[in-house]
Structure formats: C-alpha cells, structure tokens
Amino acid sequence: MKVLVLNSGSSSLKYQFIDTDTEVALCKGVVDRIGLPGAFIRHQKNGQEIVKEQEINDHNVAIKLVLEMLTHEEAGIIHSMDEIDAIGHRVVHGGEYFSDAVIVNEEVKKAIRECIELAPLHNPANLMGIEACEKEIPGKPNVAVFDTAFHQTMPRYAYMYSLPYEVYEKYKIRKYGFHGTSHKYVAIKAAEYLRRPLEELKLITCHLGNGSSVCAIKYGKSVDTSMGFTPLAGLAMGTRSGTIDPAVILYLMEKEKMDVKQMNDFLNKKSGVLGISGVSSDFRDLEKAANEGNERAQLAIDMFCYRVKKYIGEYAAVLGGVDAIIFTAGIGENNALVRDKCLTDLEYMGVLYDRERNFNVEKGKVFEINKPESKVKVLIVPTNEELMIARETKRLLSK
C-alpha cells in the first residue's frame, strides 16, 4: 500500500510518500509559509532536492503543489493519483472522541472541529489538510491519526484534575497527553529490539525535542504522561513553561496587567529554556553559551534535565519497576549531554548507564547505552511518526 502522510501546520505542510510494504519513504518534502510572502515547496527524492517559490494562498494550493511534485516528470514518484492508495493525517487533538486512528467521514470531521478550542493552533490546520485532500484527491480514503489517542488508556485517577467535577463534565477539562504516535512507535521498536512482547514490558519513553514529554507505558498501554490538557504541561521545553504553580499566573496577570492572550503567549512562546537562558530555545546554542560561561544557559539545561529525571523516578514508581528507559526525538536522540544528566545517579533503580557508549552513539538505529549487567535497559530509539501514521492507515484499511 502506498500512503501519502501529511502533517498540516497553520502555515506549513510536511509530507512523505511511504510504501508500507517496504516501509520506505519514496519521497518527502515541506510546503512552507502558506498564506505568507516568500512561500515555497522543498521536495526531496533519492537525496536530490527541488525548491520552488510561488504564491501559496491556502492549503488547497499547497496540496495541489504536493501532487504536482509527486507526479513530476523527473522529481516525481508516480504517474497518476490512482497510485495513491490512501492519505494519513496527523491530527493533534482528538479529545475523548478517539482512542484509535479512524477513517475520516463527516462525523469525524465534526468531532475534530469540536476539539478546535482544545488545540486552536493545530486542529484547524489539520482539518484544512483533510478537506484539501478530499477536494484534490477525491475517492481516496483519508485516515486521521491522533496525538492524543494512545493516551486514552490512562486510568481515570491519572487523567483527572482535582478541580470541581462539574468542570470536567461541562468542559471535558482533564489530562489528554500528546506525542502519542511517537511514544507508541518507539515502544514497539524497543520491544522488537529487546525481543520481548510489548505486553510484558514496563517502559518509560522520553520524547525530548522543542516540545517534550515523558510517558509511562505498562504492558503496551499508556498509563500516564507529562503533558496535560494542552501541550504546555510537564517538562520545561524550548519556549513552553511546563508545569508551574497556577497561582503564579494569577499573580503575574495582576502585577504585569496582562490579559489572557498575553499570558498565553508568555507561557507558550517566551518561557521554557528560552525564558530562563535569554539565549535560545535550541540546545546546541545553550550548550555553546554554557561552555562559554553563561550561567543562565547552564541553569536552563540543568532545569530541563532535572525535570526529565524527576519524571523517570515518578513513572518508575507508577509502573512498579521499569524494564527500559527510551530516549527519542531531536534532543533525546542527538544530545549526549542531556542524556548524561538525566541518567546519572539512577543506580538505585537498577540503571547502570554506560557513559562512554552514550557519548559515542551510532546514529539512525536502536542503540543501547547501558552496561551489560544493568537490570534496566537504556535505549536510544529514532522516532518515525510519519511511518507510524502510514502503518496505522494500512492497519485500518486492511480490516
């Protein structure tokens, strides 16, 4: 089966065309600056890259451009739209409606629309991507794969907030969790690597990137995760605050005369390691600054790693032990210093971490960074959300 995988953002559209039989991306690319000046498409096939600048007013035009590239004489990979078997879409928020991927119909679109207020930045764009495909590739099934779906197995006592129960009934305010597609993918890969059934394993997965979350996975099911009602909760992130005392928000709004929108921006775009360091949200810049003696950059790194470590301890308690700790995503896969700080002094948990292996990782594959005698495995697993979306699409349509 050949699946076009789409990740629609508010002003960008990332795509991969995946053959699910070989699990290879035949080509991939991004349409960027949709609706803005300087819009372009960057298309890659066999290591060759084409960049084309033109006016791209909306997601319909973006999808048309992607299809043009897929059928392009030299850069293309197919002769006609008939060779696209299905389209798999990343949808950020499925609320309580979806605990699995679904084939899109009017009812599904209505539910995605109803979750817009839970994910105002992402869901409208995800929906635009779906509707653009329905228009430009009629007759082909669209499948929605939700970031939140994997976490719908969390027990009630883990996902509820200790607010008056009526607030949950009225507004569905609860923990949802995100990065579910990534957490699920790396858990499956880890089980394959360990040659043990996923249903027997207790795993802690750390998806560390510009947005970061940790997940406790017991016997293949998510039982807790660090993000909450929105992706703002949990770890300190690139520009997001992570969990703070809610009273701080009220105090600051009063002191600084901030309205809700300003506070939202403050917490989502100006906080995290950027806010602490005053340097950058990028860990490469932070490390460089810290090495040059910038104390705030060092503090930002220390705070980030401290929180990851706290969640590892917390989730080991929740799971009643742990078989493997997994690091993935941009920082998790590539930043040895961060992993080092997160894994030091965990011997009491049975984690015997191999520092030398951590700083000499073989990229692009599952890599073990624990000592042979360690009770707990520590793995670096490259994530592949697009492949997971393609797999989910195939699974649903093969039923």
From Swiss-Prot:
CDD domains: ASKHA_NBD_AcK_PK
Catalytic activity: acetate + ATP = acetyl phosphate + ADP
Species for this entry: Caldicellulosiruptor bescii (strain ATCC BAA-1888 / DSM 6725 / KCTC 15123 / Z-1320)
Name of the protein in its database record: Acetate kinase
Keyword Kinase: yes
UniProt: substrate binding residues: R90
Location of the active site: D147
Chain's role: Catalyzes the formation of acetyl phosphate from acetate and ATP. Can also catalyze the reverse reaction.
Cofactor, free-text remark: Mg(2+). Can also accept Mn(2+).
Any single biological process term in GO: acetyl-CoA biosynthetic process
EC number: 2.7.2.1
Pathway: Metabolic intermediate biosynthesis; acetyl-CoA biosynthesis; acetyl-CoA from acetate: step 1/2
Family: Belongs to the acetokinase family.
Location relative to the cell: Cytoplasm
Subunit structure: Homodimer.
Origin superkingdom: Bacteria
Residue positions binding ATP: K14, H207, L208, G209, N210, G211, D282, F283, R284, G330, I331, G332, E333, N334
Residue numbers marked as site, Transition state stabilizer: H179, R240
Residues reported to bind Mg(2+): N7, E385
Molecular function via GO: acetate kinase activity; ATP binding; magnesium ion binding
Pfam family name, one: Acetate_kinase
InterPro entries, per the entry: Ac/propionate_kinase (IPR004372), Aliphatic_acid_kin_short-chain (IPR000890), Aliphatic_acid_kinase_CS (IPR023865), ATPase_NBD (IPR043129)
A cellular component annotation (GO) from this entry: cytoplasm
Cofactor(s) the protein requires to work: Mg(2+); Mn(2+)
Main location per the UniProt record: cytoplasm
Keywords of this entry: ATP-binding, Cytoplasm, Kinase, Magnesium, Metal-binding, Nucleotide-binding, Transferase
Keyword Ribonucleoprotein: no
